[in-house]
């Protein structure tokens, strides 16, 4: 019995030793895990503190720039007026057109394409620029009546009727010129009818105002027997904005920035003489 009891006691002691070893190992593992968690949390806090001290414009890990909310971000694209100033040395001064009524006539339209340069039709250039002039005039406070606003054919009698019914301060017709015999001829030109002294006065005044900008070639005002000028009960002028037969002027007249430029120049100088 004593031997059996001794063996049992030895077995129990051995089992207790194993349990003790296992508990010690378990405690060691738990302590290691806790230590790792503590160290990780401590390092994370240090990283956050370090990040908070960095320049807000410093690049982050993904390569994105962190913006500073206190800084104003400037759009790299220049505004339209600055582009016009830089390209054509022309600074648009928005006029006060309050109380002024102008009839705008975009020459040709529909089946009447006007003059042509390759695939470029005068009627399209006329309408595009005329609508820009319309917008600028209305922004300046003017009342505007259009003889056409789409690619439609409006005969000359109807254009005159629309203008006369409007009782406007000015009937302004916009066209593009052409001279196929000599493609080197260039320049903007203002027409009037010989029977209207006030139209002549306006044409010459606009011509001089445009010349004063010293931006593009301006030809002398001239009298022409155009129906919309001849039959207008309002002062009436026609501006030939350039020659589509000249490659350089054709390129200009179809360039969106140039169209914005010439529209502003026409609006400012026409309003200045009314």
State each model region's role:
Residues 30-34, 43-100:
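Non-catalytic propeptide/linker segments at domain boundaries
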Residues 173, 181, 222-274:
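Active-site-adjacent mobile loop/cap segments within catalytic or ligand-binding domains
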Residues 22-38:
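Hydrophobic membrane-insertion alpha-helices, especially the h-region
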Residues 101-105, 143-147, 170-174, 189-191, ...:
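Structural recognition of the beta-strand scaffold that forms the well-ordered cores
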Residues 75-160, 166, 186:
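Active-site histidine-acidic residue metal-binding/catalytic motifs
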Residues 1-20, 27:
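N-terminal Lys/Arg-rich, disordered targeting/topogenic segments
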Residues 109-111, 150-154, 176-181, 196-198, ...:
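Solvent-exposed loop/turn segments at secondary-structure junctions
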Residues 113-120, 179-205:
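A short, glycine/acidic-enriched catalytic loop
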């Amino acid at each position: 019995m004593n031997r059996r009891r001794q063996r049992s006691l030895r077995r129990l002691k051995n089992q207790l030793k194993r349990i003790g070893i296992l508990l010690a190992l378990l405690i060691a593992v738990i302590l290691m895990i806790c230590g790792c968690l503590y160290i990780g949390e401590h390092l994370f806090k240090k990283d956050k503190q370090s990040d908070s001290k960095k320049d807000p414009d410093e690049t982050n890990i993904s390569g994105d720039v962190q913006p500073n909310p206190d800084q104003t971000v400037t759009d790299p694209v220049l505004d339209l007026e600055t582009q016009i100033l830089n390209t054509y040395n022309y600074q648009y001064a928005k006029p006060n057109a309050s109380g002024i009524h102008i009839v705008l006539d975009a020459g040709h339209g529909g089946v009447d394409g006007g003059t042509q340069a390759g695939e470029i039709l005068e009627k399209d250039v006329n309408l595009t620029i005329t609508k820009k002039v319309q917008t600028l005039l209305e922004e300046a406070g003017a009342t505007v009546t259009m003889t056409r606003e789409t690619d439609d054919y409006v005969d000359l009698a109807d254009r005159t009727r629309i203008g006369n019914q409007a009782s406007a301060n000015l009937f302004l017709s916009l066209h593009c010129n052409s001279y196929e015999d000599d493609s080197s001829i260039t320049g903007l030109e203002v027409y009037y009818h010989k029977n209207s002294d006030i139209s002549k006065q306006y044409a010459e005044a606009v011509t001089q105002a445009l010349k004063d900008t010293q931006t593009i070639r301006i030809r002398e005002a001239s009298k022409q027997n155009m129906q919309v000028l001849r039959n207008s009960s309002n002062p009436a002028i026609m501006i030939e904005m350039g020659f589509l037969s000249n490659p350089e002027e054709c390129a200009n007249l179809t360039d969106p920035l140039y169209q914005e430029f010439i529209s502003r120049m026409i609006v400012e100088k026409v309003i200045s003489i009314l």
